[in-house]
């Protein structure tokens, strides 16, 4: 037991740090924003350092229910980085409404996501997922005085409960037909051709996970929740949980369902096709920038699923690279949105209100253009590279029609990204005076993200290839 505890330092640090942050908020009150914000940031930094220290370890703990390996470590670093930024930029948005619960909930959500990424058992999978989900429901409705935020939290909770029920039913079927909840045991019990009961179990488990990554047709909550939730919370939803759920999905289909590739691959292909098509088409005509970015996230999840559908190490490497680039791009785009304010200091979310932004705030307009072009996967921006990797993996796995469909969807999706850029640069100024006004921290993060996507990212391709290959090899 003591040896096992020494290998889960990231989780222990997050647990202790979350409790300390909560107590600080309880005893110091909501006026000491900087204190509990600093506590949460230091906790995440320490957890990331612990994850890096364990990067060379490959073992299991607690009777094989959790895995300590490079794959989980890679995912955790992305999760902790996204959580760090979402806490760092939050106080200015809430302007007096910031409470200690916000960083505490982020910490416990990060704890749950880390467990998801390291799970090797259906029970730990569910515990991690629910820990993340329960924190997320509260975060979505964090602005209690805002009707949209309360509505977003309620929608997320109701649909999330439905997805959890589907996942639990799938888990019960897998356990009933294999006699175990361990991933390795499930893979051994599946053998060659799975029976109809196991196939139903696979369908329900992947459906529950599909909700967490906003894959079509389990995406219904995404546009409404992204629009209604506070922007820092939306930024969090669009980044860290996607990494955790995609890592979990990769681990369960490769580790637990590997022998039944013929069954799960068809499901993943369907989710990928539906997501890239509806994500591209659904964004056309959107007038709210947060709703549009919600459809963009659905579209990008579809591209990640193309790499996963390949079922090869090359495909998983592409997915990991995609997650990193997507994280940088999405965080940058939402940080730009976070800085869009009118003269009254209110958040500007309407796309028509961005008309003439290039004249009022040329730096923000230029950065947003970089992020949008990168989300579209237009070369030479770095967002093109992960799309190329997942398409290459699909072609090498004889999934040429899927790769072709992805390319067509990329072309369609580029339309609405370019439409926003056209609004910012070529339309007449809107009546809304967008003042911006981000602080130095936000400006630095936005500038660094844009620079990385413009050119610097390509310099990291060799290092990223080594890291993603090492992480993906754990599953094969």
UniProtKB/Swiss-Prot annotation:
Its main location: membrane. It is an enzyme of class 7 (translocase). The keyword Transmembrane helix applies. GO terms for cellular component: plasma membrane. It is a multi-pass membrane protein. Keywords: Cell inner membrane, Cell membrane, Membrane, NAD, Quinone, Translocase, Transmembrane, Transmembrane helix, Transport, Ubiquinone. The chain crosses the membrane at residues 5-25, 38-58, 70-90, 97-117, 122-142, 157-177, 196-218, 231-253, 264-284, 292-312, 318-338, 364-384, 401-421, 445-465. GO terms for biological process: ATP synthesis coupled electron transport. Its EC number is 7.1.1.-. One of its GO terms (molecular function) is quinone binding. It is found in: Cell inner membrane. NDH-1 shuttles electrons from NADH, via FMN and iron-sulfur (Fe-S) centers, to quinones in the respiratory chain. The immediate electron acceptor for the enzyme in this species is believed to be ubiquinone. Couples the redox reaction to proton translocation (for every two electrons transferred, four hydrogen ions are translocated across the cytoplasmic membrane), and thus conserves the redox energy in a proton gradient. NDH-1 is composed of 14 different subunits. Subunits NuoA, H, J, K, L, M, N constitute the membrane sector of the complex. Belongs to the complex I subunit 2 family. This is NADH-quinone oxidoreductase subunit N. It comes from Sphingopyxis alaskensis (strain DSM 13593 / LMG 18877 / RB2256). The gene is nuoN.
């Amino acid at each position: 037991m003591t040896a096992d505890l020494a290998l889960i330092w990231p989780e222990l640090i997050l647990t202790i740090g979350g409790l300390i942050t909560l107590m600080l908020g309880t005893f110091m009150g909501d006026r000491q924003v900087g204190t509990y914000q600093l506590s949460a940031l230091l906790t995440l930094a320490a957890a990331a350092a612990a994850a890096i220290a364990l990067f060379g370890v490959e073992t299991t703990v607690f009777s094989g229910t959790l895995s300590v390996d490079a794959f989980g470590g890679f995912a955790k670093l992305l999760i902790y980085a996204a959580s760090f930024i979402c806490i760092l930029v939050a106080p200015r948005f809430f302007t007096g409404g910031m409470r200690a619960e916000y960083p505490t909930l982020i910490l416990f959500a990060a704890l749950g996501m880390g467990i998801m990424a390291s799970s090797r058992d259906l029970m730990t999978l569910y515990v991690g997922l629910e820990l993340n989900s329960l924190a997320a429901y509260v975060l979505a409705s964090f602005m209690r005085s805002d009707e949209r935020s309360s509505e977003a939290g309620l929608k997320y909770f109701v649909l999330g409960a439905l997805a959890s029920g589907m996942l639990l039913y799938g888990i019960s079927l897998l356990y009933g037909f294999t006699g175990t909840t361990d991933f390795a045991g499930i893979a051994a019990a599946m053998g060659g051709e799975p029976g109809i009961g196991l196939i139903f179990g696979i369908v329900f488990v992947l459906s529950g996970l599909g909700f967490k990554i906003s894959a079509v047709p389990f995406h219904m909550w995404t546009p409404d929740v992204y629009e209604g939730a506070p922007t820092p919370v939306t930024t969090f939803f669009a980044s860290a949980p996607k990494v955790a759920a995609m890592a979990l999905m990769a681990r369960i289909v490769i580790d637990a369902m590997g022998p039944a590739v013929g069954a799960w691959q068809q499901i993943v292909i369907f989710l990928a096709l539906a997501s890239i098509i509806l994500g591209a088409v659904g964004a056309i005509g959107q007038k709210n920038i947060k709703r549009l970015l919600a459809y963009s996230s659905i579209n990008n999840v579809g591209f990640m699923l193309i790499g996963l559908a390949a079922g090869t190490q090359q495909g998983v490497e592409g997915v990991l690279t995609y997650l990193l680039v997507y994280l940088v791009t999405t965080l940058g785009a939402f940080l730009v949105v976070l800085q869009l304010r009118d003269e009254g200091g209110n958040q500007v979310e309407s796309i028509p209100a961005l008309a003439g932004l290039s004249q009022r705030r040329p730096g923000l307009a230029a950065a947003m253009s970089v992020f949008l072009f990168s989300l579209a996967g237009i070369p030479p921006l770095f967002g093109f590279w992960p799309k190329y990797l997942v398409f290459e993996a699909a072609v090498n796995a004889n999934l040429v029609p899927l790769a072709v469909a992805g390319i067509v969807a990329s072309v369609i999706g580029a339309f609405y990204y370019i439409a926003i850029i056209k609004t910012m640069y070529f339309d007449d100024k809107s009546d809304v005076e967008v003042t911006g006004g981000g602080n130095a921290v936000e400006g630095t993060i936005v500038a660094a993200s844009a620079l990385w996507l413009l050119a610097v990212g390509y310099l990291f391709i060799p290092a990223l290839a080594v890291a993603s290959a090492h992480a993906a090899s754990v599953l094969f």
